[in-house]
Every structure is written in C-alpha cells, then in structure tokens.
Regions:
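Catalytic active-site module of serine/aspartate enzymes centered on a nucleophile-bearing elbow/loop
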Residues: 219-220, 225-253
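Short beta-strand/loop motif that positions the catalytic acidic residue
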Residues: 189, 195-197
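Short alpha-helix in the alpha/beta-hydrolase fold that links the catalytic acid
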Residues: 191, 205-214
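Acidic catalytic loop of the alpha/beta-hydrolase fold
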Residues: 200-204, 229
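Active-site loop/oxyanion-hole signature of alpha/beta-hydrolase fold enzymes
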Residues: 37, 52-95, 241
Length: 253
C-alpha cells in the first residue's frame, strides 16, 4: 500500500484503476481497502481511479495515535483534501460510509468547487440520545459480532479496546456540546448528491438520511428496505450498479 506525506502524518492509501478520480472514505476505525473491498476493484475496472485511504490514526496511517477532539471530522476532511492535492487531483468525486459519509459531506460543503459528485450512506449530520445509547451498547468489544471484532482486532490488536472507547467518548462529547456535526453546512453542498440508507440500520436511524436529503438541494435518496449499516457490503452488486449509474450520469444543462 503506497503512502504519501501530508501535514502531520504519512497517509497510506489504496489506489487502483485509471480514469476519473473517486475518493472512498471509510467508517470509524476502518481502512480504505477493508471497508471498500467490494467497490475498489469493481470501480477500478470501469474507468475510475479509486483512492481509498486509511484516515489519520487508523489502519496503516499510524502514527499518530488517533484522538477525537471536537473538530475531528473537520480535521479528517482537511486531511482528505491534502491527500488529493498531493496526488494531483483538483476535482474528484467522493464516496463515504458512516463516519466517512460525515467527512465527505463536510468536504463537499467546504470546497464545493473540488467535489464533483457525492455518494454518502450510514452518516448523520447531528447526534441524538438514541445514537449515543447505540454506541454505548457496543462500547465493549465483546458486544460486537465475532466477525467485526475479528476484523478490527487483526488491524489494531490489543489497542482496539482503548481506541474504540476513546471513539465513543468523543461521540459523547460532541453530543454534550449540542450534537450538530455539520447540519448547518448541508445547504452549502451544491454538487449532485446520492444518499443511500439501510432501513434496518441499528446505528443510524432513518431520520438522518432524510435530514441529509432534505438539507442538500436536488439530492436523491435510495433506501434498501432490508439493509442494515453495511449496505455496500451486503448488497454490493445493487449498490455498485446504483452508484455507478449516478456517478456516470451526464450532468443536466
């Protein structure tokens, strides 16, 4: 996996394909190659250059040790812009899952001239007590599914428990501060946007994709009626076809 220096760290990233640049941002604690294993080769084979990084403090982009200050989503957005600039991409599409959806939407709002299209799923523009309760229900790794725990343990080893506890504490602090992650910025997103959601997502209630959809003018919303949090993995064929059609649709004049 190649790496490139950006302010504060050496960021590792997966790169595949040739064509239009497509940045894929993983979820909390996730890695680009792991979270998007069903998307990277698929899109790379269809005239996209996929860039799927390990965000600051995650996966192979360590050090630094990951922390969660009040601006961590915005810091991650700045890192992603720095990565794409270092790779020579001035304009690019962005796909984000979960925390990656939050980062991606912030990017599209902050520098709309750089983000050509936006695909987001599993994110939320604000926090409620329901999400905090859901996080605390899985605060102990023993409460995770064996598969999820095994996947993350392979990346972080014994550091996983403390890292995840710090993450949940960071979410609690954001909620205590009012819980607005980027809801106030949604109106600044001007690029074509596709919002996807699993109707049975146990972590992100349906009010969140609805709020993002309503907040971004002209955005589209697609619901996977039986989907949970990992719609891009569980329904990879349908997900890939839907997002590919959106990303390649000619812009309206």
């Amino acid at each position: 996996m190649p790496a490139i220096g950006i302010p504060g760290l050496s960021m590792h990233y997966e790169s595949a394909g040739k064509g239009a640049p497509l940045l894929m941002i993983p979820g909390a604690l996730g890695t680009g190659a792991g979270d998007f294993s069903a998307q990277i080769p698929w899109f790379a084979a269809r005239r996209f250059q996929v860039i799927a990084p390990d965000p600051r403090g995650y996966g192979q982009s360590r050090p630094p040790q990951r922390d969660f200050p009040s601006n961590f989503y915005y810091r991650d957005a700045a890192d992603m812009f720095a990565l794409m600039a270092a790779l020579g991409h001035d304009r690019f599409a962005v796909m984000g899952w979960s925390d990656g959806a939050n980062i991606a939407t912030i990017m599209a709002a902050q520098q709309p001239e750089k983000v050509t299209r936006l695909v987001v799923f599993g994110g939320q523009s604000f926090l409620t007590a329901e999400e905090i309760a859901a996080f605390n229900a899985i605060r102990k790794i023993s409460a995770w599914s064996p598969r999820a725990a095994e996947t993350m343990r392979a990346v972080y080893g014994e550091e996983l428990d403390e890292l995840w506890d710090r993450y949940v504490a960071g979410q609690e602090a954001l909620f205590a501060a009012g819980g607005d992650l980027y809801r106030r910025l949604l109106a600044k997103v001007t690029c074509p946007t596709l919002v996807l959601h699993g109707a049975k997502d146990p972590l992100v209630p349906g009010l969140h994709p609805e709020a993002i959809h309503r907040g971004i003018a002209g955005s589209r919303l697609h619901i996977f009626s039986e989907g949970k949090h990992n719609i891009h993995q569980r329904y990879a064929d349908d997900f890939n076809a839907l997002t590919f059609a959106f990303l390649t649709q000619p812009e309206r004049s």
